[in-house]
A protein has these predicted regions:
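Short, surface-exposed binding/anchoring microloops in extracellular/periplasmic proteins
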Residues: 156-177
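Tryptophan-paired
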Residues: 51-114, 173-253, 286-291
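Short structural boundary motif marking the start of a folded domain
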Residues: 17-25, 55-57, 101, 159-161
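Conserved "repeat-terminator" motif of extracellular CCP/Sushi domains
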Residues: 151-158, 219-221
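Bacterial Sec-dependent N-terminal signal peptides
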Residues: 1-39, 256, 280-291
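Structured interaction patches on ligand/partner-binding surfaces of diverse proteins
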Residues: 80-83, 110-149, 236-269
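Hydrophobic, glycine-enriched assembly/anchoring segments
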Residues: 259-291
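Structural motif
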Residues: 27-51, 164-171
Length: 291
């Protein structure tokens, strides 16, 4: 439905005081959709402050013209969120013309390199890194004498891969993980594009159960993201097996969902048994195929 717009001053002149456009920014995805079935110990109290979920923000308010083009009115880049409020309120100049506007917010980024404002898109895995746990929202709204207070709910752009390791032999303290077939870019409307991969290194502790978490964009194709994990010995510890390489595993990463894998080393057979957590149960994987 087309929304009528008025940029004339007659209506505003009849008002004692023009109400400024006010937007409360909230966090919608405070927990992952499947946190209870995957890593329940990571479930967060949803009454924590806004900044505990989204510590930094960038936002843009643009006027939406009749021809569909946008004109940037206000833009704030990469600032830290202060205070302990559950929402982050934004208020604009009360002299701003009535009309139709587009409000876009990005949050959680530690580096500006992830956000390309010129192209209005977010780079999900800069230089093949996991990047940050980034949120965004984009709302189209009407500002007039009757409509001036809105709420925008930020949603998570990525999912998370959790990898458990058990019974690694002594000396193996480094794990590298490469995940292919992931989306590389997302626009404010949550349309994902381009293909990329992620490479991640993490220190682990041999002989004990260790957990590693990696933020990952949704899979480029369902069930086609390949997880390639390798375990390395510290230099100088010497062994005929300096690298342990389990079989590759195919997964399907999704936005705001957790995928959990477990690699259990069997020293007697010199091999790994790999499991995926499905509906709160561990299912064994054979040759990329779930049992």
């Amino acid at each position: 439905m087309a929304l009528a717009m008025s940029f004339t001053s007659c209506v505003r002149e009849n008002l004692d005081q023009c109400p400024p456009l006010r937007i409360n920014i909230e966090v919608k995805d405070k927990n992952y959709f499947n946190v209870d079935q995957t890593v329940p110990d990571e479930k967060r109290n949803e009454n924590q402050s806004f900044r505990s979920f989204v510590p930094s923000l960038s936002y843009r308010l643009s006027r939406l013209n009749d021809d569909g083009t946008q004109q940037v009115v206000v833009e704030e880049k990469g600032f830290g969120v202060e205070g302990d409020g559950l929402t982050y309120p934004v208020s604009f100049d009360p002299d701003m013309p009535f009309g139709k506007y587009v409000f876009t917010v990005w949050g959680g980024m530690k580096t500006r390199g992830e956000l390309n404002l010129d192209k209005n898109e977010l780079l999900l895995h800069p230089e093949h890194s996991q990047g940050d746990d980034v949120y965004q929202v984009c709302d189209t709204l009407v500002y007039d004498e009757n409509h001036y207070c809105y709420t925008s709910e930020m949603e998570r752009t990525k999912g998370k891969l959790v990898i458990w390791t058990e019974n690694l032999p002594a000396g193996y303290h480094l794990m590298d993980t490469e995940v292919s077939q992931l989306y590389g870019i997302v626009n404010p409307s949550f349309l994902y594009s381009e293909e990329t991969s992620v490479f991640h290194e993490s220190e682990i502790e041999a002989g004990v159960k260790t957990k590693t978490s990696i933020f990952l964009a949704p899979s480029f194709q369902k069930d086609e993201s390949v997880v390639d994990v390798n375990f390395h010995k510290n230099s100088g510890e010497g062994s005929s097996l300096s690298v342990l390489s389990p079989d590759d595993v195919k997964v399907s990463m999704e936005r705001n969902k957790i995928t959990v894998l477990k690699y259990v080393y069997d020293s007697d057979r010199n091999r790994f048994t790999i499991y995926m957590k499905v509906n709160d149960n561990w299912e064994e994987i054979h040759g990329m195929i779930l049992d």
